[in-house]
Every structure is written in structure tokens, then in C-alpha cells.
């Protein structure tokens, strides 16, 4: 009997374990499928947005055709020989168009009138590849003749060798040869076809070069900012190269990332970039930065390339590309009546840094003749000591004594972790939003892998509702109200504070972290995520 009971108990234990394992496996698979569906939905949403943008572009192109019809109508007015070439329907259309007086919209030809001299000025002189479209990420690599050493082959190997098979189907690498010497261009193409024949035939790699007629006369440029005539010509041509490459790449994918021809990359870079972008799909960012150096690793949403190219064309002779990009952000969000700190906070919402850097510059000899550049990205080998999120625009302040420049402002903007000397009772960290925000949840993480013991202890999380009166809140929430109008909604446990915000408290004017008791350790804050409500 004991044996039978023991056998039954063993069988029951086995069945229970099996059912538990089956349930967990089903739940885990369901969770993974849900995450995959969410990513597919975000990608679909982004493609719909791009489709809307392209419809708008087509409308603009049709308007241009209408303007051309008007010019034809004006030029053929009174010329019977010319008019006899058109059908009755065309003559009727020309008459209708010519009779309408509408304003002319300026185009890029105003800034680059030389393009009108040749119909093929905006068509690649050389174009190798399958013309792949519909990918997530387009990588643009401009390359020009270097006097000492070319790094292009090594760069492409680094990019391609660090892609998984499925990732190779979801991107395209466009190599732009910024030279008009057709023999040189064909030589580069031959080398690339020999080294990357499989990648070119599959559609992963494309190679283009511009026609000579694309470039204006660059011999009489104004010298500015103390740059020599040669350097001014170099940076001006570089701006034009970027524009041609962006225009070609825009129709190919959801995102466009600007690279250079003398870099190496980290493992898993593609998945990291794509997931980071998808996490920010609900935010109004303009630039994601995956490197600290120059124009390397700067990623844009494809529809935004139109504005960027137009802006660069307007000022391509005036300043380098990185300065022009900063000017675009300034024009979009900075208020001349506010101070520089306010402007930096606003720009930080459009220009988001990812840490650590995914791309490292390795070229010693610049494409500018005679220039040696020992530039390396210091963040490339650094461990990830902070986690970046996009938070609502806010003015931040603290009573804590900051250690070695690890400021709260840098943490909130995703540039560095916050590090402060031993907190005492009464110390605070304050995030005062520029305008009231509906907040869904919050997460504050203290300490990091280098200093895991520097955490916030005996610290509470408090919010200040925008409305001080008339709040329809529960008794439980009401009991959390403090004398100064803040509500205590959470606290740090084991260095972490996270939770949901009672919707009845929204919109929120400020978040505050308040130290209740003296601490025996310093404090690091390496993650701040104040998540806005979606509705």
C-alpha cells in the first residue's frame, strides 16, 4: 500500500511538473510572439507614415509637371506650328493651365541653378546593384579618393560580417563614390564586385556615383571660419555628396544611417539600432546618434531627409554638415527669448544619444589631402553605465553635491550617469516639466556595474499634479498628499523605484525624489524613465 501511494504521489508530482513546464513554455512563447507582433506593428506604423509622406511628395511632383505645362503653354502662345504638335485634349489642358495665375514655389534649382543645364544631373552616372527597397535600415557610405590608404574594403567587411542572415535581408548598404573620374570609379566598382559579388547580387550592397554635372563650380568659394580655400572646397563638396546619397537612399527604407568609409562596428549593431529606434517610435525624434564623432552613426527617419537635404542645399557653401544639422534643430525647437540651457533641453528631445557607441573611427589619413586625424570615439569601448530613455522636456535641479561633472542634466538628456556625494535627510532631486504631462509610469534605477553600492536609500518618489484643487481621487491616494501639494507615490527598494501613476493625478507638473534619512554611501542615478501616457 505504501508503495502504491508512493507511486501515485510520484506520478502526480510528475504530471504537475509537466503541466507547469508546459504552461510556462506556452506563456513564454506567447510572450515572445506578443513582442514580435508589437515590433511588426510599430514597423507597419512607420511604413504607413512614410507612405503618407511619399503621397505628399508625388503631389508636389505633379504640381511641378503642371508648372512645366504652363511654361510650355506660354512658350507656344501664338505659334501655330508648335501648337499643331499637340492633340485637342492637350491644347485644352494647356489653355486651362495657362489661364490660371498661381505663385511659383521655390525649389532646389534656385540654390543649384546649374542642375537645369543637364537633364541627368540628378541621375547616378554609375549604379550597381538590385535596387532593393522596403528595408528597415539603409546605411550610406560616402567614399572618395585618398592619397595614402583606402579603408573602404575593411569597413564593408566589418559591417557585413557582423550581420546575421535575416538582418542581411532587412537592410541595404549604399556605397557612394564621390568622384567624377569615370576610370577611377570603374576601378573602385571592379574591386567591390570582386570582393563582394555575393552581397551585390543579393541586393545587400549597392554602388553609385554622381554625374559630373551634379557639382557646381567649386573654384571661387568664399573662405569662412578661418578655413583654407582647399578645406572650404572639401567641406562644400562633402555637403553635396551627403545630399546626393540621402536623396538616393530615401525611398529604400524606414531609417537612414550615415556612416563613413573608415570605421569598424560592434557585434549585434544592427539589432541594437533597430530595437532602439522601435522603442522610440512614439517620440518625435529627428536624429539618433550611435557615435560621438562627426557625422558617423547619425540616423534619421526617411521622411525627414527631405527637410535635411533642402536645408543643406540652402547653406551647403556656408558651413560643415554637423553645424548645419545643429542649426536645423535650433530652428525647430529653440526660443530666442529663452537661455541656452532651455535650448539644449529642447534639442535633446530631437537629438538622442545611444551609449555606448556602436561605431569606431579607424582611419588615420583623412580624405582631405595632407590631413592626419587621430580621432577615436572614447565611448566605443566603455561599458554601458547608464540606460537611455526619452523623457518629457523638463528643468532639472538637485540639492545634492555633484561629483566630477556627472550632472543630473546630462543624465536626463542621456549623456552620462548622475553621481553625488553622500545624501542627507532633506536632499532632493527635482524634475519640473516645461508643460504638464500625462504620465503612465516611472522608473528610477540607482548604482551601476562599476559602483553597485552607490544607490539611493530611504528615498521617496513624489509627484505634483498640475491641478491643486478639484482632483477626483480615491481616499488611498488622498492620504498620500503632503503639505506642499506633492503626492508620495513610491519609494526606492534595493536601489530601484518603479511604479504606475494614478491617472486621477494627471497631468503632472513635476517629479521629486526626496531623501528621508541620512545615507552612508554616495549615490548614482543611471536610469530615469518617466513614461508619458499614450492617450
From Swiss-Prot:
The chain crosses the membrane at residues 5-27. Residues 28-535 are lumenal. Pfam families: MGAT4_cons (PF04666), MGAT4A_C (PF23524). Inhibited by UDP. The keyword Chaperone does not apply. Residues 1-4 are cytoplasmic. Its EC number is 2.4.1.145. Glycans are attached at residues 77, 458. Pathway: Protein modification; protein glycosylation. This is Alpha-1,3-mannosyl-glycoprotein 4-beta-N-acetylglucosaminyltransferase A. The gene is MGAT4A.
